[in-house]
């Protein structure tokens, strides 16, 4: 049975939880950071495996507690700075389908793979995960991102063609607040009735001095 849910994956009663990871030994953001804090031994083991180049996309790394898979680490990106790719999600899901019996996994909870810091959206990932996992004879929970519309948790939505949407995540860099201040200042000057037209060279030199004073360059 497969269920689509909203909520905290750490409150799941499934025996195995899935963690999303990169392949360079960093768990600094998002759900991976929570796993790192909750399971420090798992993190040290994962970091060591990354150092030995044993972690790669298309392979899910199981972490055992009490002789069973407690955490299944799922690479959704190569480097922590890079966006997730849908092909990595598909490869990992294929690996899981081929290996869950060998790992003796009987119930499992997945986060929205590649969403959040990975840059993929639920409209892409949700249908792919549902269609890949829905026929497996084990208990599966898939947690959608917080704030997902209820209509996008329904089977009718999840059965749409996942190939219609972008397959690479998008990483948006947060703009430096100082630069934002400069842009707003320039806009105000241009709109001002006291705006004095100057040549490009003089303007550039003055702005260069301003940037240096602001510590932007």
Task: Report the location of each language-model feature.
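Macrodomain-like recognition of ADP-ribose-binding/processing modules
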Residues: 1-217
